[in-house]
Amino acid sequence: MSLIPRPDGVRSFRGYLASAFLLSALPSACLAAAHPSSPTPTSAPTNTTSALVGQRALYDLSLAESGGNTLSATGNMTYVVRDTCSAWSTQQHLDIQSATRNGGAVNMVSDYTTLESKDGRHLVFRTVQKSNDAVLQVVSGEANVDAQGHGVVQYEKPIKKTLKLPDGTLFPMAHTAAILAAAQRGAPNIAPLLFDGTGPDGAQETYITLLGWGPPKDPVTSPALANQPAGRVHVAFFSRTPDSILPDYEIGMRYFANGVSDMLDMDFGDFRMRGTLHSLTLPPRAAHC
């Protein structure tokens, strides 16, 4: 996939958005045909995000490898998570400049906001994606999951419609909490469904591989992470269609116990981008909660 604006450019750009969601929280079983093993199932949470923290993180993005149309790519991503006592408020700004073999210079920008209840049952979302200042797509609406794990999403944009969410679908912060919980108990993999509001097609399949959990082996990039256990995480994203055998995109990262990541490796097929933590601020927990 490529950064050049094309009919599937919105879908391609969704991979960058998913990368950012996994930082905060970064989106059921994966397709059995694609993954013969049986990953640990997950279910809708009651309140699983208590270990996560508010944060303001700035990442530098650079091209790590290219075998396709992308000649160069750089950018930055700002991610802000606020603890509002009963919910998590997130804001993300992503700005990527690239050069392609046949498309010249391209500037891809996204602005994304969510409000996710801490019980994992309600999500309000809005995503605006642009290429060279032209709006590619706006996705907005809200989603709800009941106590039994049955969910529904009501889109306002790009068109008004209602979709059912598969049982067990997790929202972004709950998805991250599930990853961290699995890492801490030593699970080798999990495969929860994710709905993050970055696209108009409902939930995605995710397959998550977890490697090692404990004191970081590599130096940490921020003093705020010095005493946090961490582990390596690899996430593959799949469309929920019968022919989706290969992932749409993949992300590797080092996750800390508080939900912060300081190293990213984003694989989009014909090129890879590396993300490094430039600065991190962890605000104190609200005393009135």
Feature locations, PLM:
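N-terminal secretory signal peptides that target proteins for export/translocation
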Residues: 1-13
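Bacterial N-terminal signal peptides
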Residues: 16-29
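N-terminal cleavable signal peptides for secretion/export
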Residues: 30-105
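A short, structured loop/turn motif at beta-sheet edges
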Residues: 48-53, 80-89, 115-121, 225-226, ...
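Short hydrophobic/aromatic-rich beta-strand segments that constitute the beta-sheet cores
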Residues: 61, 90-92, 123-127, 262-266
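Hydrophobic/aromatic-rich structural module bridging two neighboring secondary-structure elements via a short loop
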Residues: 92-145
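Mature, soluble, non-transmembrane domains
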Residues: 128-289
